From Swiss-Prot:
Full protein name: UDP-3-O-acylglucosamine N-acyltransferase
Record text on subunit structure and interactions: Homotrimer.
Its biological purpose: Catalyzes the N-acylation of UDP-3-O-acylglucosamine using 3-hydroxyacyl-ACP as the acyl donor. Is involved in the biosynthesis of lipid A, a phosphorylated glycolipid that anchors the lipopolysaccharide to the outer membrane of the cell.
Pathway: Bacterial outer membrane biogenesis; LPS lipid A biosynthesis
Organism: Pseudomonas fluorescens (strain SBW25)
Length: 351
């Protein structure tokens, strides 16, 4: 169902300065290039300013500087991208689940499901689980024993929570995510791997989002902990006993080994890997495909590996890398020979 909201109502909702008719009706959102005469757009990135003049949008979210000289209707705000984020929820077409339990769902007798929660078809809620008001549990979800889901959470179809997972309020978990699976713990005795029972749980804070097919393993002893406001993209692996600080965000395919601690307000780009038992301080940005092998104690941006280059150049560089040891030995020999004939005997490349 398409929402229709007047421009004046949007201005009031955002606390924006309205330039244009408050009665103009907005039915959706679109980019500057694609917006039609009933859609709202926004300009947040300067590289798209070239599309502003010819945009057919009904109105545009703009900073004050960009609004100068713009002839169309506008909502003037300090941060157009943040304003767009807030408005997007007003036009979200995602179906709203009705409260109640689907007849095909299986609910343990001692599970507590608030009447204002929604439990979808073929969902399973095991013994001792507690589901708060406003929670949506999608079709075919599994909620293990003694799990807790705080108010207004949303679980897409086919989410799995193993036993003893505690989730805060307003948490979003996408399809295929598995929370509380057994951590990868084994003791080796004479070449034979002996399984270690993973007796901890998972603790997830408020306002967390977890993407499609992401795995958060339960702790070996203490809980694996995901802080408030953490955002995890698709296909991320969080190993046992990992701790992630508040408002840290990770892009797809990040892998974090066991017992690593990540601070608050960090950003990990796609494909980052971290070894186990290290600490990452607050306010760290790690670029894509970086391999983190030791603790980071200072805020800032960190990278590893080589940047993209034409394949022929990369092959030459790779060949030279294999020769580095030999080149270092030859350089040392040359330094020694030059040092033998240099006054003072100092021919080091460091001198």
């Amino acid at each position: 169902m398409t929402a229709t909201i007047k421009l004046g109502e949007l201005a009031e909702f955002l606390g924006a300065t309205l330039r244009g008719s408050p009665e103009k009706e907005i039915t959706g959102l679109a980019t500057l290039q694609e917006a039609g005469p009933a859609q709202l757009s926004f300009l947040a990135n300067p590289q798209y300013r070239k599309y502003l003049v010819d945009s057919q949008a009904a109105a545009v979210l703009l900073k004050a500087a960009d609004a100068e000289g713009f002839a169309g209707d506008a909502l003037v705000v300090a941060d157009p991208y943040l304003a767009y984020a807030r408005v997007s929820h007003l036009f979200d077409p995602k179906p709203k689940a009705a409260a109640g339990v689907h007849p095909s769902a299986v609910i343990a007798d001692d599970a507590q499901v608030d009447p204002a929660a929604s439990i979808g078809a073929f969902a399973v809620v095991e013994s001792g689980a507690r589901i708060a008001a406003g929670v949506t549990v999608g079709a075919h979800c599994f909620i293990g024993a003694r799990c807790e889901i705080g108010a207004d959470g949303w679980l897409a179809p086919r989410v799995t929570l193993y036993h003893d997972v505690r989730i805060g309020e307003r948490v979003v978990i996408q399809s295929g995510a598995v929370i509380g699976g057994e951590g990868f713990g084994f003791a080796n005795a004479k070449g034979i791997w002996n399984k270690i029972a993973q007796v901890g749980g998972v603790l997830i804070g408020d306002d967390v989002e977890i993407g499609v097919n992401t795995a958060v393993d339960r702790g070996a002893l203490a809980d694996t902990v995901i802080g408030n406001g953490v955002k995890l993209d698709n296909q991320i692996q969080i190993a046992h006993n990992v701790q992630i600080g508040d408002h840290t965000a990770m892009a797809a395919c990040v892998g974090i080994s066991g017992s690593t601690k990540i601070g608050k307000h960090c950003m990990l780009a796609g494909g980052v890997g971290l070894v186990g038992h290290i600490d990452i301080c607050d306010n760290v940005f790690i670029t894509g495909m970086t391999m983190v092998t030791h603790s980071i104690t200072e805020p800032g941006a960190y990278s590893s590996g080589t940047a993209m280059q034409p394949a022929a150049e990369w092959r030459k560089s790779a060949a030279r890398l294999r020769q580095l040891d030999d080149m270092a030995r030859r350089l040392k020999q040359l330094e020694k020979r030059v040092g033998d004939v240099t006054p003072g005997g100092n021919a080091s490349s460091e001198g």
